[in-house]
């Protein structure tokens, strides 16, 4: 069985192939490198909080490390991270890891690869074995927790009112879309095709805090980091629609781990 350190070394060596002559990654790739490190850290917190055994924690750790492996080649080829304009990055990541053979002969190979493959799907497949299911849910939760951080950082460090590139160039002053509001109220995943405004983009993350975070540990971490309060305040900058407080209040019990 390959150690996590050995797998990390292989991953880092692969990422290094995208560095320029100055030794630096392109800025958007560097963001993904940092994101991956944060997802790994989140996965470890979840595994500890949920009391996973060493075998399960190891599969979660490996899957978190590898979940976005394809992002670097995606940006190089297509100059975008938007899957609808390029490739499904989870499938791409799965295929690259498989092609590299990093997990060949590893008894957790299929569990880790499956977690990479489905980490961005709207729904988790049925019929997963316990190890795979734990890896899948942990990576999905850990990824969302860092996506919360990334959004907050983008809002704090960019002129989002005039350059909304990081948010798919969505309108910044339009009200939330009815389809998005309905999905959040019904506690079901939002269809990304229904995201029409920046308010929608932020509200889907509000919805995640109740129906998108699988583990109580993940919901506790989200609450401790103040992610819901940040989104409530930011949404008030985007719209005066009272639905903002309605939906944020709806999440509070779940974010507290209820």
Q: Where are these predicted regions, by residue range?
A:
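Divalent metal-dependent phosphate-bond-processing catalytic cores, especially two-metal-ion Mg2+/Mn2+ enzymes
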Residues: 2, 28-33, 37, 41, ...
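A generic, well-ordered mixed alpha/beta core segment in the N-terminal half of proteins
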Residues: 88, 92-102, 116
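His-Asp-centered metal-binding catalytic motifs of divalent-metal-dependent phosphohydrolases/nucleases
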Residues: 57-82, 93, 111-122
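Amphipathic, well-packed alpha-helical segments that form the structural scaffold of globular domains
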Residues: 19, 41-44, 70, 98, ...
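Sequence-structural signature of the catalytic-core scaffold of metal-dependent phosphohydrolases
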Residues: 87, 110-120, 131, 150
